[in-house]
Amino acid sequence: MTIKIRFPKDVREYARKEKVKESIIKLTETSLAEAITNFHRRMIILQGDTLEKAKLAGILAGGVARILSEYIPEFLDRKLRDEDKIEVLYATDALGEDTYGRKRFEEFRKHFSVLAPNAELTSVTFKYSRDILGRTFDILVLDLSYDYSPNDLGRIIETVRGGGLIFILTNPFEKWKDMWTGFHKSLVTPPYTIDDVKKRFNRRLIRKFTEHKGIYIVDADKKKIERRPRKNKSQAKLPEREKVEIPRDIKFPRELYELCLTRGQVEVLKALEDLIENPGMVVLTADRGRGKSVSVGIASIGLAITSKKKNFRIVVTAPELENVQSLLKFAERSLKVLGYKTKTVKESGLIKEVYAKGIGIRYYPPTKGYRQKADLYIVDEAAGIHVPILHRYLEKERVVFSSTIHGYEGAGRGFSVKFLKKAKEKREYKEIHLSVPIRYAEGDPIERWLFDVLLLDAEPVELTEEDYELIRKMEVYLEEPDLDDWFENDREDLRHFVGIYVLAHYRNRPSDVALLADAPHHEARVLRLKNGKIVTAIQIAKEGGIPKAVIDKMAKGYKPPGNIIPDMMVKHHYAKEFAKLRGYRIVRIATHPDAMDLGLGSKALELLVKEAQEKGLDWVGSGFGASEELIRFWVRNGFAVVHLSPTRNPVSGEYTAIVIKPISERAKEIVKKANDEFRLRLTEWLGDTHRDLEPEIARWLFETPFGEAVNYPIHLTKVQRKRLEMFIKRVLTYDTVVDAVKPLVKLYFLDGWMRPYLDDRQIALLIHRVLQAHDWKETAKLLNRTELYTMIELRDIVRGLWYYYKHMLKDEEKDIS
């Protein structure tokens, strides 16, 4: 079916009255015709200094809404949309009274509401843009005139469906190239000023507008088209969705299959049907916008109603509640299609729980979901969740893992590399990949533009056998890349650099690229092979060198932007002198996923520390989620642990550790003291704040690169000494001598490199039973031993420690009589 794309007569007359050129109207009609015919999106940039761009957006969007509203029945019939109303989104940085953002919105609305009074207009500020997740719009007006974050760009643009238009309001490009935005102001950290902030990201964004198809540019003030389609169009051929055949042998209700828009979605429902009778695991991967979460939402309800359970509980988890909005929305819709009355619970405007008779589906953060009892566990955006947490869900009877490969939540092959490889060793599972987009058709130019500008599909360089030979010989060098060159000339090295993070365990956000591009204190380092290929990526933040006045404020509670390590040292170690010293904080370090565990990360650290030394810096440090693997990596590379956060990260489930490697003599003195203090605190924290810390992590936190014991006297009274000896001789039980054993165990962990050797299991036993005070049953389970064996082993360890350390305690004995 071919439809006419032409603004209604009254719209054209209104536009002429407002002095809108016919050529700009034709440009908009052509853009819409292209969008509908291809079921893609099109973008029109309206640049200008005045309110003219907002007025123009209001008139053009009004005309588009009127055209689209005429053909809603045809769109519904072809399953190109669900809603029977044209939905328009206006997104801006501010809507408060007397703000420029508000003035532009009012100017837009003044004209739009006259021309398209029946369209549903939603306005949102970037701060609350997550409120529109799970919704789909026909028209988007995105006001980038002052402030925006790249995260907003990725999140908002992807809400527009195929056949829709995006109007972007900007300042004149020449002005915008040199502008500082609110995002830029957030990057200023002492001792830098706004003048030090770069503008590489905006320039990249502007350049990308002109490089991709489907993007047209209008100077609103001059009423001049600067980039137009090759030829005008006044007709559009309505596209058809791919024909989806519903299998004959289905177990879920047919109504649920009728909600599917692609064969891939049907396959997801069929896969979950297999879980009705038998427990199992399904893994689902897709690029963004392929209907992955929607499919799981529909299938979960199918599983719930076909099971024989009276009350079917579904636990849904993801890094953030916003990640599962489509899933929960379609779970609710599926229930309604089947005639159920539903109840939803929302949190900050987002759906958190959906209930119907005998069915409950609820979101939990990753660290809490696996602790709940449920009949089905759904782990969405799994690549953004730390691998040890994923393994907790791996143990569940019925579990679905889904993950975005490329896109706003993407983590590339990292999910496969880090998790699925090991999962295969534990259990069988069915893997499905969805490739056909739902919201728009394949080949959408706006998706290509978005992926390009935000580097969402970046991947590292491919490695050959010759490259591995260079790695084995460690023929590598560290380099500081020219970020101006990388961003201005769109070098492949930039994609390879970001691609390493995308495929590593890091959870990437579009703003990470902008931070690297523009933050004055952020720099990149790369470890290259002799042939130039990047194998390790490092992002560093320059910290310290803080003025005394700011340091004094920090000591009283002020938190300066950036300067994470100096701020921690001032507040938690009262080391005000440290804030004057200068150093590198390693924000992110990752090695090519195909070259892991070959020593490249350690080599990169070695060369970075050498560079810092040559530049006269005082220290190199980092903050990260404290997994056993990472703590061991940093400690073995000579870094001292100086802090551990009191709470776990709700997404990764890890405590955050901060490590420092001192370079200057003054830094060595301060860091040595801080490391001693930390180790001392940890002996107490393990019985309280960090009672749930994994012993295998705790043991590495006690390690020190300085090799010396903490200078802290341990006291035992004469009676405690006697009771300790009676415990060793099997006269008294452990529970009656805890007060005497604990100081002895503390002495062991506060000792230096000369402490007696204990194996990993023995160390775990001391931490779990003595310092963390867990009972015998829990400790035996941890060690995979019987309770009796565990009791005997603890007594043997204490005997050895007592014979080794009792001479040190001799002079410290006190009598309390």
UniProtKB/Swiss-Prot annotation:
Binding residues for ATP? 265, 289-298, 439
GO MF, one term, reads: ATP binding
Q: What Pfam families does the database record attribute to this sequence?
A: GNAT_acetyltr_2, NAT10_TcmA_helicase, TmcA_N
Q: What class of enzyme is it?
A: transferase
Q: GO:BP terms for this protein? A: rRNA acetylation involved in maturation of SSU-rRNA; tRNA acetylation; tRNA wobble cytosine modification
Q: Catalytic activity annotated for this protein?
A: cytidine(34) in elongator tRNA(Met) + acetyl-CoA + ATP + H2O = N(4)-acetylcytidine(34) in elongator tRNA(Met) + ADP + phosphate + CoA + H(+); a cytidine in RNA + acetyl-CoA + ATP + H2O = an N(4)-acetylcytidine in RNA + ADP + phosphate + CoA + H(+); a cytidine in tRNA + acetyl-CoA + ATP + H2O = an N(4)-acetylcytidine in tRNA + ADP + phosphate + CoA + H(+); a cytidine in mRNA + acetyl-CoA + ATP + H2O = an N(4)-acetylcytidine in mRNA + ADP + phosphate + CoA + H(+)
Q: Which UniProt keywords apply?
A: Acyltransferase, ATP-binding, Cytoplasm, Nucleotide-binding, RNA-binding, rRNA processing, rRNA-binding, Transferase, tRNA processing, tRNA-binding
Keyword Cytoplasm listed? The answer is yes
Q: Where is the N-acetyltransferase domain?
A: 469-664
> Where does it localize?
Cytoplasm
Q: Where does acetyl-CoA bind?
A: 589-591, 596-602, 629, 636
Could you say which EC number(s) this protein's record lists?
A: 2.3.1.193
Please provide, in alphabetical order, the Gene Ontology terms of the cellular component aspect for this entry.
Answer: cytoplasm
Q: Which InterPro entries does the UniProt record give?
A: Acyl_CoA_acyltransferase, GNAT_dom, NAT10/TcmA_helicase, P-loop_NTPase, TmcA/NAT10/Kre33, TmcA_N, tRNA_acetyltr_TmcA
PANTHER family in the cross-refs: N-ACETYLTRANSFERASE 10 (PTHR10925), RNA CYTIDINE ACETYLTRANSFERASE (PTHR10925:SF5)
- Give the similarity note: Belongs to the RNA cytidine acetyltransferase family. TmcA subfamily.
Q: What does this protein do?
A: Catalyzes the formation of N(4)-acetylcytidine (ac(4)C) at the wobble position of tRNA(Met), by using acetyl-CoA as an acetyl donor and ATP (or GTP). Catalyzes the formation of N(4)-acetylcytidine (ac(4)C) sites in rRNA, tRNA, mRNA and non-coding (nc) RNA, almost always on the middle C of a CCG motif. In hyperthermophiles more acetylation is seen at higher temperatures.
- Protein name per UniProt: tRNA(Met) cytidine acetyltransferase TmcA
This protein's gene is called tmcA
